[in-house]
């Protein structure tokens, strides 16, 4: 019985570890999304190019493909600073 008890407790530790990994992944993706909204809103009252530079630096620090894709998609809004370029499309 002690062998079975120790095996089941090992299984519990593995499941706890997996759930912790999943929660950290979901936290990571939500912070990526918030960085994305900052990135895409570079032309929304932030001073155009100068406002977008801060978003670009933040995107480089995060270093994800999603951020890079949003930078490439939103370069026009960052450069022009148009008032109707708020958020990601």
From Swiss-Prot:
Q: Which Pfam families does the protein's record reference? A: Coiled (PF05710)
InterPro entries found in the cross-reference section: HssA/B-related
Q: Give the signal peptide as a residue range, or say none if absent.
A: none
Describe the family membership recorded for this protein in Swiss-Prot or TrEMBL.
Answer: Belongs to the hssA/B family.
Designated name of the protein: HssA/B-like protein 22
Q: Which organism is it from?
A: Dictyostelium discoideum (Social amoeba)
């Amino acid at each position: 019985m002690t062998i079975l008890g120790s095996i089941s407790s090992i299984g519990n530790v593995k499941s706890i570890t997996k759930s912790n990994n999943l929660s950290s992944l979901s936290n990571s993706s939500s912070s990526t999304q918030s960085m994305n909204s900052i990135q895409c809103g570079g032309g929304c009252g932030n001073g155009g190019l100068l406002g977008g530079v801060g978003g670009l630096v933040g995107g480089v620090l995060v270093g994800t493909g999603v951020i890079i894709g949003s930078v490439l998609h939103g370069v026009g809004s960052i450069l022009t600073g148009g008032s109707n370029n708020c958020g990601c499309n």
